[in-house]
Amino acid sequence: MAMNRVQFQKGLSMAGFMKQYGTKERCHAALVASRWPSGFVCPHCGETHHSTFVHDGRQHWQCQACRYQTTIIAGTIFQATKLPLTLWFLAMHLLTQAKNNVAALELMRHLGVSYKTAWLMKLKLLQVMTERESSRVLEGRVEIDDAYLGGERVSNT
């Protein structure tokens, strides 16, 4: 039997995940690199010259041109959260590495949060994943392995 490339594609192990995103500082650095890959750009005026300062334990960026202040989580699903970024990143990892759906109850147990919190985290993460992929169109040959299709069975009477 031929080896299925999809089943054996390299993923990110839990040990690899913890090494890459296991601390608050590493999660913060990953967000900065993702949001501003070429360096800070003011969302208000587009200027790149800025200063940084810490207020209430959070790093802020201030535009030198218009004095607009922002944080790395402003305007994201993390904006109003009291949870550490490490929990959000772990939730993202668990949701993206599972072959099947990860239940909110399972997230609750893995993350050590309430059911309501786990459910809201999952909802927000799935919403942004859907938004990002909604404009993407698959091209060429598309192979689907272990598809789970649902819905009510149509009666042929």
Give, region by region, the residue ranges found by the protein language model.
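Residue-level recognition of single "structural anchor" positions
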Residues: 1-157
